[in-house]
Amino acid sequence: MSQVFQQDLTDTSVRPGGLFFIELLMAEHFDMPGRDTMVEVLTKYLGPVDCFDHRRDSAGFAPQNYKVHYEDTDADIPPTLMVTNCEKIDKPVLDDFDRSQVWDCPNVDELLAECQYRVFATDMLASGLAAKERADMLVKYVDALLELYPSCKAVVFGPSRKFLSRESIENHPDKEVTRFMYYAVNVRYFSIQGTNDMMVDSVGMSTLFLPDLQYHFHGVDPNHVVFHAYNVL
């Protein structure tokens, strides 16, 4: 019998334009790469970066090819890319609801059991970037992080909770900015208890101040609706 979930109408964790964060999951502890190595790899993918912080527990970078204009000071300032130290996972990475919406990783349970450590990475002060510019920065940031952390086996993207294996990211045929939709946007499927109705929605596009979608329907193959959602996005 399928598990029944109750929607939390008080949840405000998904905020348009909010932080984009990811979790890099790995089986063993992995020390943060050295400052020079991180600058070299990030520069390879993102262009010139300034490293303004590199300590045991975190590192911070400013990608110079991406600038947010602040009208009050008439200044163009790069956003911030942050990486935390590797830590032991002390509670489930995905709750039951998130796990029910993993569609692109058949061995998700195996990876969740194997990966006992994680690294958090996020952007900050990036909401002022144009949607395409921010998406471009973020997908390249993901590529750089996978090179910096070769033991990473899977990635969880927030706030959509999209779960992808390392291989599916590296082997994805789309190498353009549009892969943001594959990485960071989760199209979810629900059947509504006590009815023949179904719902498909997306979560993740609001990070770029772009609209997410919701379909409420019955009598239609949900796979067709999911396909339509990705095409519309």
Task: Indicate where each model-derived feature is located.
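N-terminal alpha-helical "arm" segments
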Residues: 1-45
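Glycine-rich, often proline-containing surface loops adjacent to acidic residues and nearby aromatics
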Residues: 17-21, 110-128, 204-214
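N-terminal low-complexity, intrinsically disordered segments
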Residues: 30-110
